[in-house]
Every structure is written in C-alpha cells, then in structure tokens.
C-alpha cells in the first residue's frame, strides 16, 4: 500500500467517524427524549449488524430500520412466539445463510424462545406479513 493510499484510507475513516457522530446527534435531536434515542440507536445498530453479517455470508440483506420497527411494533415489542416477554433478539425464521436478513425472515424474539426455536420450531403468534413478504402496520 502506498502512502497516498494510506492517506486516503485515513481520510475516509475520519470522514466516517465525523459523519457517524453527526448522524447520531441528529437522531438524538429528532428522538425528543433520551429513552427514544436509546431505542432507535439500539435498533439501528441491531439492523446494521445483521445486514453486515448477511452480506458477509453472501445472503440477501434488504431489511431496513423502518421495516424492522414496523415488524417489532406489530408484535407490540414482545416476542413473536410466546407474546409474553419483551423481545431481545432479531431471529431469522430461515437460517441467515439461507434466508438472509429480509422483512419476511426476521422476527423479534425473547432469548428463551430463540433457544427453544432452534430445537423445536413453533409458529409465531399471528401473521403480520402481507403477501409480498413485507411487514405491515396493524
């Protein structure tokens, strides 16, 4: 790698950090409350992490933050399987490497159901997906 290439990479890295901070500060302003900011920041990080993971496996990666929030809200922020506990993880109905991170493949699930789901797959409560496979607001 040349010095010029290294300078360019450092410049891009610096730009990324600065813009990331700008995006986060804008989200904080728009959220209105610290609680709303923490929720949106957590879910943004969750979606981004799953998108990166799906891409690294060469799987489909189309889920957006808006789609994820609609899905979570359609289950009242509770586990899609037991509907008793708050959701804790983004669960893939079809294994990530096969089904990707898409609106039709992602569900909000508690850790207990996620663990049990791997052994004996239950069906989620209610169908919150339209025929095109994307989430709809209830």
Regions found by a protein language model. Give the residues of each.
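Short intrinsically disordered terminal tails
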Residues: 1-4, 127-138
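BZIP DNA-binding basic region
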Residues: 1-50, 105
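Residue-level marker of regulatory loop/turn positions in helix-turn-helix DNA-binding domains and
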Residues: 37, 41, 60, 71, ...
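Short metal-coordination and nucleic-acid-contact micro-motifs, chiefly zinc-binding Cys/His arrays
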Residues: 45, 72-76, 102-106
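Intrinsically disordered, low-complexity regulatory regions
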Residues: 53-54
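Short cysteine-rich loop/turn motifs with clustered Cys
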Residues: 59-89, 110
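Histidine-centered nuclease catalytic patch
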Residues: 80-108, 121
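Short Cys/His-centered divalent metal-binding micro-motifs
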Residues: 106-131
């Amino acid at each position: 790698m040349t010095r010029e290439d290294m300078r360019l990479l450092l410049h891009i890295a610096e730009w990324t950090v600065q813009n990331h901070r700008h995006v986060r500060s804008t989200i904080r302003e728009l959220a209105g409350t610290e609680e709303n900011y923490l929720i949106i920041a957590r879910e943004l990080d969750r979606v981004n992490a799953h998108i990166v993971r799906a891409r690294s496996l060469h799987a489909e990666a189309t889920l957006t933050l808006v789609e994820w929030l609609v899905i979570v809200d359609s289950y009242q922020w509770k586990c899609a399987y037991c509907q008793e506990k708050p959701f804790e993880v983004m669960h893939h109905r079809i294994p990530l490497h096969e089904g990707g991170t898409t609106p039709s493949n992602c569900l909000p699930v508690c850790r207990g159901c996620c663990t049990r789901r791997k052994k004996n797959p239950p069906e989620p409560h209610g169908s919150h997906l339209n025929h095109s496979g994307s989430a709809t607001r209830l």
